[in-house]
């Protein structure tokens, strides 16, 4: 009986340790930001994220609207000196968005340490004639009704594309590509999907 009791205690301890390790992910911080940028002509837009999704659709001819959903990676113990909650708050307060006229970059981390501790999902509306580059390390891409050339790539996510401009290129390392109503020539490439 005593050995069975020891096994029960060990199993309970192992369960407690496993649950404790999962708690940071279960209670991960999350915040959002919302920005609208004015443009006055053809737009060149670059959107990148490490592990989030990217959705791009057409909107107003003179605005780019960006909504970001920032989530912590739960990696506060990796030595950057701050908590995951701090990283999420910093990104939400000062999103990684740069604009130089009609050239807009979204998601470039500019060497910030927080970039390794958060995941950002992007929902973007932009003029239909935008030239777009969208990259995600491991998230899905959904792009529709963009008449400009689109270069979209993801390492391990899927790509859903509809009505893209001629000369577009869609690539995924290990996901699937679902594309329809593409204009002109378009290159589709998948590694293992």
Q: Where are each of the predicted segments found?
A:
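Acidic (Asp/Glu) and glycine-rich low-complexity loops/linkers
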Residues: 2, 6, 26-49, 53-136, ...
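Basic polycationic patches enriched in arginine
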Residues: 9-10
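Bacterial N-terminal signal peptides
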Residues: 13-24
């Amino acid at each position: 009986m005593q050995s069975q009791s020891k096994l029960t205690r060990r199993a309970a301890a192992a369960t407690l340790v496993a649950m404790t390790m999962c708690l940071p992910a279960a209670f991960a911080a999350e915040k959002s930001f919302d920005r609208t940028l004015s443009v006055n002509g053809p737009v060149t837009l670059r959107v990148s994220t490490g592990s989030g999704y990217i959705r791009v659709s057409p909107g107003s001819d003179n605005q780019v609207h960006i909504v970001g959903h920032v989530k912590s990676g739960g990696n506060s113990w990796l030595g950057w000196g701050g908590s995951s909650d701090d990283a999420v708050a910093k990104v939400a307060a000062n999103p990684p968005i740069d604009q130089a006229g009609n050239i807009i970059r979204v998601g470039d981390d500019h060497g910030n340490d927080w970039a390794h501790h958060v995941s950002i999902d992007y929902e973007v509306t932009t003029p239909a004639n935008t030239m777009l580059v969208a990259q995600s390390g491991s998230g899905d891409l959904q792009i529709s009704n963009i008449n400009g050339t689109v270069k979209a790539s993801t390492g391990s996510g899927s790509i859903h594309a509809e009505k893209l401009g001629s000369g577009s290129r869609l690539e995924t390392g290990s996901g699937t590509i679902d594309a329809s109503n593409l204009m002109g020539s378009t290159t589709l490439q998948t590694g293992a999907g």
